[in-house]
C-alpha cells in the first residue's frame, strides 16, 4: 500500500475514484469517499505448529463465506473452515480452528495474544469501504453544497488513511511487546504464492471490467 494508492481515490483527479463514481451513478448513487482497512495476514495458535510457509499445510483456518478467501486458503494447502466472527475466539480456544485471517490492529484490539502466538505475514487481503449518497439528492444540491460534501469526504478519506496506518503500526508494536512470532516471507515465497494464485485470478477476473483491472494494476506498480 502506498501514497499513489490513496491518490488514485482522490475525488477530484483520482482515476479509480472517477471509474467507481461513474459506476455508482449508473445505480443511482454518488460516491462521496472511500475508506481503508489494513492489510490482513494469518495468525495462528501454538497448537497449529506453524513455523514457516511450508508448515501451514492442512492447518484449519477460519474464513468467511467468501469464495475468494476460501480459494486463497486452499492455494496455501490449508483447510478453510467458515466460522462467524463472534464465534472465532471460542473456536480458537477449543481447537475448532487453529488460525484466522486478521490484521495487526484488530489482533491487538481483540487481545488475540491471549490465544494466538504467531503471524504468517502475507498482507494479501484488504477491503475498501464505500460511502455513497443518493444521486438524486446530491444533484438537487447547489454546486457549493456539493463541493462541501465532496471536500469533507476527501478530508475524511485522507485522515482515515493516516489513522489506518497508525492502527496497523500500533498493532504490530503490540505483537512485538507480546512476543508474537512474526514469520516474514521472502520475495521468492511471495512470488510463488502469486504464481499459484493465477488460476484463482483467472476464475474471477473474467467477470471484472478489464478497464477497472488495468486501473488497479497501474497503482500497484
Residue spans for each PLM region:
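Core domains of carbohydrate- and sulfate-ester-processing enzymes
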Residues: 14-20
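N-terminal secretory/targeting leader peptides
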Residues: 1-6, 22-221
Amino acid at each position: 500500500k502506498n501514497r499513489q494508492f490513496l491518490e488514485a481515490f482522490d475525488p477530484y483527479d483520482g482515476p479509480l475514484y472517477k471509474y467507481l463514481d461513474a459506476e455508482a451513478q449508473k445505480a443511482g448513487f454518488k460516491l462521496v469517499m472511500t475508506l481503508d482497512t489494513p492489510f490482513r495476514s494469518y495468525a495462528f495458535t501454538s497448537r497449529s505448529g506453524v513455523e514457516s510457509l511450508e508448515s501451514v499445510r492442512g492447518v484449519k483456518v477460519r474464513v468467511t463465506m467468501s469464495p475468494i478467501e476460501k480459494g486463497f486458503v486452499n492455494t496455501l494447502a490449508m483447510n478453510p473452515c467458515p466460522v462467524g466472527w463472534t464465534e472465532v475466539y471460542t473456536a480458537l480456544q477449543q481447537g475448532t480452528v487453529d488460525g484466522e485471517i486478521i490484521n495487526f490492529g484488530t489482533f491487538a484490539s481483540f487481545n488475540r495474544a491471549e490465544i494466538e502466538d504467531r503471524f504468517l505475514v502475507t498482507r494479501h487481503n484488504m477491503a475498501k469501504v464505500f460511502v455513497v449518497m443518493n444521486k438524486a439528492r446530491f444533484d438537487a444540491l447547489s454546486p457549493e453544497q456539493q463541493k462541501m460534501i465532496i471536500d469533507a469526504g476527501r478530508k475524511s478519506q485522507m485522515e482515515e488513511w493516516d489513522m489506518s496506518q497508525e492502527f496497523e503500526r500500533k498493532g504490530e508494536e503490540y505483537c512485538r511487546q507480546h512476543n508474537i512470532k512474526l514469520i516474514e516471507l521472502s520475495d521468492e515465497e511471495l512470488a510463488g504464492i502469486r504464481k499459484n494464485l493465477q488460476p484463482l485470478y483467472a476464475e474471477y477476473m473474467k467477470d471484472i471490467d478489464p478497464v477497472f483491472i488495468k486501473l488497479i494494476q497501474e497503482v500497484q506498480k
